[in-house]
Structures are given as C-alpha cells and as structure tokens.
Amino acid sequence: AHVDRLLWASSTSAAERWIAYTSPHRRPAFAAALATRLKAADADFKVQEARASADSEASLIAARVDALRASGNSFGARTLLANRSTLAAPAPVLKDWYQLLLTHAQAAKEDGQYDLAYRIASRVDDAVPAGVLMLDQDIATRDRYTSLTWLAGSVALEKLGRPRDAVAMFERYAAAAKSPQTRSKGLYWAGKAAAKANDTTSASRFYERASVFYESFFGQLALEQLRRPMPNVPQVAAAAPVIAAGSVPDVLLAAALASKYGSWRDQSNFFRAIALNADGKEDYVAAVGLSRKLGRPDLAVMA
C-alpha cells in the first residue's frame, strides 16, 4: 500500500493525507504507526485500537521497535520482534525490514540472548510476497536474508542445541545464494546440522548437493564427509573480457574505470557486484580474468 511505504520512509505528512483512503481493516494500524512516528500523546491508545494488527503490520511494528529503542528499551524492542505475529502483508521495503531484524538479532546474540536472537532472525519468510523467490531479489536484500538465516542457523546449532531448526535455516541460506562458495557453505552446514540431529539420510543428501561444487572449500569438505576423492578439476584459462563499450556488461566497464580513477572502496563495490552476480562458468572465468587484468586478485577470491 502507498501509505505503508510512506510510513516506512517516515514521510508522516504525506501519510497523514492518505490514511483516510486506506482499507478500513488496515487503517487503525496505519493511524497507530503515524501516531508512534510523530510521538503523539495518544500513540499508545492508537496501538491498542489497532488490536491484533499491532503485532502483524510491518510499518507499525517497525515504528514501535524504533520508539522502544529510542527510549532505551532495547530488550522490549527485541521481544516485540521475537513475539510478533505473522505479517498481515509483505514488508513494504523488504531489504529494510530484513535490516531491522538483523540489527536487533545481532544485538541480542551479542548480549547472550540466544533464544531472542533466533526467534527474530528466523522469521524471514512472511515478509516476502507469495511466489517470489529470494534468489531473484537484489544483492542488498539477499545479503541481509542470508545474514539472518546464517545467524539463526548458527545460534540454533551452537547455542540452543536445536540442530533440526538449524537445518532449515542453513537450507534457506543455500537456496538464496548464487555463488558456489555460499551455496555449498549452506548445504554443507545443513548436512552437519542434520548429522548432529542423527538424521544421517538427510545429512548425506546435503553433502551430496554440496559436493557438486567441489572446486569450493565447503564442497571439498562435503566430499571428505562422503569419503570420496577429489575429482579431476578441469583447467580453464581465465581470459580477461574485452573492455569495450557495447561488448561487455556495464558493471565490468564501471569496474575497469574505477580501477583507473576511483578509490579502493569504489573498486571493491563494483568487484563485489560482479562476484555476487556471476551466474555460470563463463561469468566466473571472466571475473577471474578481469581480476588479473586490473591487478585485483581479491576479485578472484570473491568470485
């Protein structure tokens, strides 16, 4: 909804003008979110009026969490995120919703509040519209999603003694990953968690899937778990792409220019985008070749 996005962006004046045109069943939550953002005297009353929506509307939850944190009640903010209901509608800005969850889940983990950290970080699915694949999302959204699922999986496995929950999180991590390194990492750790849960069948299945990426570190660890030798790795010459307008993607041209004129940070941002968007052998060969041409071996490592 338009108002949902306005509230998410803290565009309170514009949101106030549009609230009257929203659907009756969502209007109380929008009014409560607006009152909370404005620090209105009746904000708490508006939240009570919203009833169940107070815990299921992303824009209202975010407003309440921010208000609690600003008042110094970080534990209350984390508890709200951990105990919330399933979202009534997809988050208005997915990457920002995930950043909200990640910020508080990481803080909870750092403070030793492992159950809270898991319950915040593991609630990733209800924010996504039905039928939408995380693999198709932009880099920022996928990065925050994988950070959340990795945090939830590692906490479940290492701190809470819940390996079956860890399996589900690591499998989500792998499903959202595009590079062989990150995909094999998620599958390998899903296998480790399944083995710890005494589910040897599932563990073997995850190791099998990870071992497909035998050129990566975790793919090789998966082969070790399966007691298989390393296959013969075909030698592929890494040829740098021709840097000419119209013949290569814009991001490669931008990386080449950044290597000549930009800062190290600018270069790294472009190289990271190239590595994260690589999809297929040709892309990885081109990335490694470009790293050699531009004198940036770290791009080869990223890829």
Label each region the model flagged.
Residues 1-303:
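Cell-wall glycan-active module
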